[in-house]
Amino acid sequence: MVNNMTDLTAQDAVWQTRDHLDDPVIGELRNRFGPDAFTVQATRTGVPVVWVKREQLLEVGDFLKKLPKPYVMLFDLHGMDERLRTHRDGLPAADFSVFYHLISIDRNRDIMLKVALSENDLHVPTFTKLFPNANWYERETWEMFGITFDGHPHLTRLLMPPTWEGHPLRKDYPARATEFDPFELTKAKQDLEMEALTFKPEDWGMQRGTENEDFMFLNLGPNHPSSHGAFRIVLQLDGEEIVDCVPDIGYHHRGAEKMGERQSWHSYIPYTDRIEYLGGCVNEMPYVLAVEKLAGITVPDRVNVIRVMLSELFRINSHLLYISTFIQDVGAMTPVFFAFTDRQKIYDVVEAITGFRMHPAWFRIGGVAHDLPRGWDRLLRDFLDWMPKRLDSYEKAALRNTILKGRSQGVAAYGKKEALDWGCTGAALRATGIDFDVRKSRPYSGYENFDFEIPVGGGVSDCYTRVMLKVEELRQSLRILEQCLNNMPEGPFKADHPLTTPPPKERTLQHIETLITHFLQVSWGPVMPANESFQMVEATKGINSYYLTSDGSTMSYRTRIRTPSYAHLQQIPVAVRGSLVSDLIVHLGSIDFVMSDVDR
């Protein structure tokens, strides 16, 4: 394979971030495997993108994992149907591709490996031998694209029903309900679906019992109050002890990534709110930032601060629900009612600013929907005066309670290696002592201008530590909001850029060119340059990211959404084996997840 640096947007090179092309890891790879072993792809992801031969994939992955400052986390893994992609000059011939996104904590750098595949040979070796969390990602990639991962321990459907036919993210798979035959649920089909959901321990390498006694197999969910959504865990029990378990997800899957291929860059924004439905504007942030990278838009300072302010309000809102429901899972009811009182005050601020409460869809490509209304500062001031004392009450009344401590300290505990192996992020990772918060490590939207601390645990992540870190994160978010209130910049709420969407309305009555642009961008959608873009943010539950591929049209060619809850649920069996069922309930409460974030 010839070494080749290809820039898909050479005509717009002023906006091309080329720092990642000079990343030291490129030289390390060339020194080890030779100068002609790879194709290095220039993108707007800010990440070195290296196409490797399928035969060298595991060797390259192992090399990166053993470097002096190693790439210790598999952050994401998925695929792409390349067959209809027109802008791919200089890239290896491929009908399909698989990408592997690795993170080095010590370097604070990423690398993305890509493997090109032909349609008649969709096979690639499993990555689970290097990174155990590749398991779910490979299962999902197989069911969405039909790519087989040789050597995978259990390559079966994950998000779709077991009886589903076809691979939905292929370009030749229908994207609309009207393209399917009418659905009918006959009695025979219902029986077939129920039979398909029957758990068979042998399929998972489990024994039904020992010489002396049988194991019990218990369904926890998908409609159990402690499963926090439509989520099923099949437990293998020896009395009350959990011998093993199998999480079963997908009941909340809505095809969010497929929808991205049928919506314009602008009209997809409301869908982002519903990925993690408690996060509100936090969900919009990585998407609009990734699109702005494609467009080459730099937003005004006022926009950055407004976005940070809304994100931190939603972070507090989500954390309050998480902390109170965790306490409820342990057995106390009162904090839930306290939390909903406090969350109402947050919604008062959010609704006054955006016009909506849970799903504002308020961020825009190049800015926000409208400027801050009169009186926003008074509402925020009232909340900031109220909340700190309430946090003290939560700690004193519940979180310092000896019963709660006894139920949660040392439960579902794991260390740094386990957290990295399973792709844990957010408080789940920082509780192990690893200081990695994207707002500090890789600042975006002006976070580098704010004074705040990152709470970090002492080396072991257990249920209690994870919750207490979230409490301290609340205090830090209040610090950030105080700075937003006191230092809100003057200026426009949208960037003056041709791809800002919607364009400034006031110009449409003065210039025919801007009138035409406004009409096209609102009705048809803005056309983004052909390239790839990536943005990760510190969301409410860990790191959330969007990896966008544009083929030079009004819609995304491929929208990949990486969510933190997905990785955290995959880790459940490792964390709870040998524990009691009651410990599992506490652990589920400590993870902080919603199933929409898992299933997308």
From Swiss-Prot:
Subcellular location per the Swiss-Prot or TrEMBL entry: Cell inner membrane
Highest taxon listed in the record's lineage: Bacteria
Region feature NADH dehydrogenase I subunit D, mapped onto this chain: 214-600
Role noted for this protein: NDH-1 shuttles electrons from NADH, via FMN and iron-sulfur (Fe-S) centers, to quinones in the respiratory chain. The immediate electron acceptor for the enzyme in this species is believed to be ubiquinone. Couples the redox reaction to proton translocation (for every two electrons transferred, four hydrogen ions are translocated across the cytoplasmic membrane), and thus conserves the redox energy in a proton gradient.
GO terms under cellular component: NADH dehydrogenase complex; plasma membrane
Annotated region (NADH dehydrogenase I subunit C), positions in chain: 1-190
Catalysed reaction, written as an equation: a quinone + NADH + 5 H(+)(in) = a quinol + NAD(+) + 4 H(+)(out)
Molecular function terms from GO: NAD binding; NADH dehydrogenase (ubiquinone) activity; NADH:ubiquinone reductase (non-electrogenic) activity; quinone binding
Claim: Translocase is one of the keywords in the record: yes
Transcription as UniProt keyword: no
Keywords: Cell inner membrane, Cell membrane, Membrane, Multifunctional enzyme, NAD, Quinone, Translocase, Transport, Ubiquinone
InterPro entries reported in the protein's UniProt record: NADH_DH_suC, NADH_DH_suCD, NADH_Q_OxRdtase_suD, NADH_quin_OxRdtase_su_C/D-like, NADH_UbQ_OxRdtase_30kDa_su, NADH_UbQ_OxRdtase_49kDa_CS, NDH1_su_D/H, NiFe-Hase_large
Annotated Pfam families: Complex1_30kDa, Complex1_49kDa
Record's protein name: NADH-quinone oxidoreductase subunit C/D
Disulfide-bond pairs as recorded: none
PANTHER family assigned: NADH-QUINONE OXIDOREDUCTASE SUBUNIT C_D, NADH-UBIQUINONE OXIDOREDUCTASE 49 KDA SUBUNIT
Gene3D superfamilies per record: Cytochrome-c3 Hydrogenase, chain B (1.10.645.10), NADH:ubiquinone oxidoreductase, 30kDa subunit (3.30.460.80)
Membrane topology: Peripheral membrane protein
Quaternary structure, from the entry: NDH-1 is composed of 13 different subunits. Subunits NuoB, CD, E, F, and G constitute the peripheral sector of the complex.
EC number: 7.1.1.-
Organism: Citrobacter koseri (strain ATCC BAA-895 / CDC 4225-83 / SGSC4696)
Family: In the N-terminal section; belongs to the complex I 30 kDa subunit family.
